[in-house]
Amino acid sequence: MLKLTPRQAEILAFIKRCLEDNGYPPTRAEIAQELGFKSPNAAEEHLKALARKGAIEMTPGASRGIRIPGFEAKPDDSSLPIIGRVAAGAPILAEQHIEESCNINPAFFHPRADYLLRVHGMSMKDIGIFDGDLLAVHTTREARNGQVVVARIGDEVTVKRFKREGSKVWLIAENPEFAPIEVNLKDQDLVIEGLSVGVIRR
């Protein structure tokens, strides 16, 4: 890693603190506020300089897409990050950013929850998943028929009940007003992002 300026070292230290304290990196806006920059754009320029020097790695288009090579945050057993927005109706493009954290032990859920997803829509209301709820999600790529999954179709994410027969998958709503989403695995991409392991209402 190339030598950092004092300002760059300060930003890197703040990123490490966020990773240690929260388990996830800060946004550009949070960096700007902490370091007294006038706008997130100024923070972005410093982050690009840190990336060029090999101090961090950046994921384009992600508000918290900052990684420090070789740095592993200590697992936090007292909270879970609230990530993005997931449609519980017609799928929408999910915003993959962490809104805040929720003070709850991941081990409260079984299997252990990895994050919370904020639900928008009423397509799963008949099993008690309502608009605004936080869905506890266990990360896995595998799902069995009948399980409630977080599924990604292309760049869109939705919460539905999973059913598969051969190369066809149905993502089924728990609300008669919503038709099932049919996916042919031969010509459509479908990724299981995780399983629902609980719901939090605040």
Curated annotation (Swiss-Prot):
Recorded hits in Gene3D superfamilies, A to Z, give: Umud Fragment, subunit A, Winged helix-like DNA-binding domain superfamily/Winged helix DNA-binding domain
Q: Which UniProt keywords apply?
A: Autocatalytic cleavage, DNA damage, DNA repair, DNA replication, DNA-binding, Hydrolase, Repressor, SOS response, Transcription, Transcription regulation
Site positions per UniProt: Cleavage: 88-89
Query: What's one GO BP annotation on this UniProt entry?
Result: SOS response
Q: Which InterPro entries match?
A: LexA (IPR006200), LexA-like (IPR039418), LexA/Signal_pep-like_sf (IPR036286), LexA_DNA-bd_dom (IPR006199), LexA_repressor (IPR050077), Peptidase_S24_LexA (IPR006197), Peptidase_S24_S26A/B/C (IPR015927), WH-like_DNA-bd_sf (IPR036388)
**EC annotation from Swiss-Prot or TrEMBL:** 3.4.21.88
Record-annotated active site: 123, 160
UniProt entry tagged with the keyword Magnesium = no
Tell me the enzyme class. Answer: hydrolase
Q: Does the keyword Protein transport apply?
A: no
Q: Which GO terms describe its molecular function?
A: DNA binding; serine-type endopeptidase activity
Assembly behavior:
Homodimer.
Q: What does this protein do?
A: Represses a number of genes involved in the response to DNA damage (SOS response), including recA and lexA. In the presence of single-stranded DNA, RecA interacts with LexA causing an autocatalytic cleavage which disrupts the DNA-binding part of LexA, leading to derepression of the SOS regulon and eventually DNA repair.
Q: Which family does it belong to?
A: Belongs to the peptidase S24 family.
Protein name (database record): LexA repressor
Q: Which organism is it from?
A: Pseudomonas chlororaphis
